[in-house]
From Swiss-Prot:
Residues 192-276, 279-361 form the RCK C-terminal domain. It is found in: Cell membrane. One of its GO terms (molecular function) is monoatomic cation transmembrane transporter activity. Keywords: Cell membrane, Membrane, Repeat, Transmembrane, Transmembrane helix, Transport. One of its GO terms (cellular component) is plasma membrane. Belongs to the AAE transporter (TC 2.A.81) family. YidE subfamily. GO terms for biological process: potassium ion transport. This is Putative transport protein KPK_0013.
Length: 553
């Protein structure tokens, strides 16, 4: 068997063993995709014992390409919501998550100085303790840029593997200790979250109001500031027994019933101006009006604003809602359309069909991956990651690297959505497949490289002390911030658990947090809010630590 064929076969074996280990769960918690690392260590140990030679250049390429795939697909997935998460609504969550990252870096620095831990080892312990694989890749790359020998850099993978198991367990233990310490009732926390999120930014509501303000009589809808804003959409108007789709120039009359869509606080303000809410139904059933969901797939409308389509004037159709990446938004006239957006249309069937044809509504296109934008994004990301940032007094230039560059570029492209006929939408199933493939390849190689000396390090070397250092790096930041967030900020427990999981970019911890309450989405929401920024910081932190430690030594 050729060296290349042998290398591929061994990697496949690592993936099989590792994924099997990851699927083993104890009390509902397992290593998940992290099991591939341990599969690599096991196979790597026996490969080393047997004296089998694998292709080092090929392993190195597979490791780096796997990392690029992983971080790029993460960026594309969370890009649409990343910049929104940095606004005021997620500021508090992100500040606490940043504090966890900073404390982790400080604990790592203190341990490095107190116990004189070798730089590659302490960076590996840090990456494993915070369960962040891209941090491992970023740390290895900066060490190579600093001229550290390859065999020394590979120690990072070994120390990462030592610290990784408690990294996962430590998050779960912190959630449990916070719950125990504050005597938290999860059911009540879920109820409080639902009550508070009634005014949340992510939920759209509808109300039917009667026009009671005499100043609005015979006024065109477009002249009513409340109804001509980007915060509320008036999708139906009922006058007597007639239900119609209102156009901007439609004159409203006293006694008209309006069906409004928007955020609760905006609807409340509209109610104060227009009139009281009524229980009368404005359902389209039994009328010639229909409500349908249409998907934007036509390349010709990508990037256009809703107002530029003129669907009200041309087709007598109203766009009442816009669903983007699972988040419902008000279909404001200034919103730009992106591939995969789902629009709620209200109008007559023939008019809706005409608008749907203009928007595309080709469901099969949602399952197709446009590969050209994928490789454009990866290429631009690698270029961005290769740009050196020279800081006076530092021995090496700081770079985003192969972990940070593609991630930042994917976040930007995911937010932009489309440029001309190129769109960066990726079907969730395709995104997940590429992401899983990337992380499996990366962890398989890291495990293989670490496996040869792993057992000896654990039984005869400093393996146990590395595990202890990892426990400190995991536990101190999580417990400190967990207690502060609950005690001082009075943060909802389920939201807190999601934030802790997101601050460690740890899907198994999110799964555990979600299982605390079956129907509450609090944990998932806070996880998604902090994840993008934390992922970026986790990639940058080991590079900063490496450059600082190297300069001081």
């Amino acid at each position: 068997m050729s060296e290349i064929a042998l290398t591929v076969s061994v990697l496949a074996l690592v993936a099989v063993v590792g994924l099997w280990i990851g699927n083993v769960k104890i009390r509902g918690v397992g290593f998940g995709i992290g099991g591939v690392l341990f599969g690599g260590i096991i196979v790597g140990h026996f490969v080393d014992q047997a004296g089998v030679a694998l292709s080092s250049p090929m392993l190195h390429f597979i490791q780096e390409f796997g990392l690029i795939l992983f971080v790029y697909t993460i960026g594309i997935q969370v890009g649409p919501g990343f910049f929104a998460s940095l606004r005021v609504s997620g500021l508090r969550l992100n500040l606490f998550a940043i504090l966890i990252v900073i404390l982790g870096g400080l604990v790592t620095a203190v341990l490095h100085k107190l116990f004189d831990i070798p730089l590659p080892v302490v960076l590996g312990i840090f990456s494993g303790a915070v369960t962040n694989t891209p941090a491992l890749g970023a740390g290895q790359q900066i060490l190579r840029d600093l001229g550290v020998p390859f065999e020394v850099v590979d120690q990072m993978g070994m120390s990462y593997a030592m610290a990784y198991p408690f990294g996962i367990c430590g998050i779960l233990l912190t959630m449990w200790l916070v719950r125990l310490f504050f005597r938290i009732n999860v059911e009540k926390e879920a109820q409080r979250f639902e009550e508070s999120s009634g005014n949340g930014h992510a939920h759209l509501h509808t109300i039917n109001v009667r026009v009671e303000n005499p100043n609005l009589n015979q006024m065109a809808i477009q002249d009513v500031p409340m109804l001509n804003s980007d915060n509320i959409v008036c999708s139906r108007l009922k006058r007597g027994e007639l239900l119609m789709v209102p156009a901007p120039g439609t004159l409203i009359q006293a006694g008209d019933l309006l069906h409004l869509v928007g955020r609760p606080e905006d609807l409340h303000n509209a109610q104060l101006v227009i009139g009281q809410e009524v229980a009368t139904s404005l359902s389209t059933r039994g009328t010639d009006l229909k409500v349908e969901r249409v998907v934007v797939t036509n390349e010709k409308v990508l990037g256009k604003k809703i107002r530029d389509l003129h669907v009200k004037q041309r087709y007598d159709v109203v766009i009442s809602r816009l669903n983007r990446a699972g988040v419902e938004l008000v279909a404001s006239s200034s919103a730009s359309l992106q591939f995969g957006d789902i629009l709620n249309l209200v109008g007559r069937q023939e008019a809706i069909d005409a608008v749907a044809a203009e928007l595309g509504n080709a469901q099969q296109k949602l399952q197709q991956v446009q590969m050209l934008p994928v490789f454009i994004g990866i290429g631009l990301g690698v270029l961005l990651g290769s740009i050196p940032l020279f800081i006076p007094g530092f021995p090496a230039a700081l770079k985003l690297g192969l972990a940070g560059g593609p991630l930042i570029m994917a976040l930007i492209l995911g937010r932009i959505g489309s440029i001309g006929k190129l769109y960066w939408f990726m079907p969730p199933s395709a995104n997940l497949a590429l992401r899983e493939l990337g992380i499996v390849l990366f962890l398989a190689v890291v495990g293989l490289k670490s496996g040869g000396d792993f057992v000896a390090t654990l039984t005869q070397g400093e393996g146990l002390s590395w595990i202890a250092y990892g426990i400190f790096i995991t536990a101190i930041p999580l417990l400190t911030v967990g207690i502060l967030a609950r005690m001082l900020a009075k943060m909802n427990y389920l939201t807190l658990c999601g934030m802790l999981a997101g601050s460690m970019t740890d899907p198994p911890a999110l799964a555990f947090a979600n299982n605390l309450h079956a129907t509450s989405g609090a944990a998932a929401l806070s996880y998604a809010t902090v994840y993008p920024l934390v992922m970026f910081l986790r990639i940058i932190t080991p590079q900063l630590l490496a450059v600082l430690f190297w300069g001081l030594s």
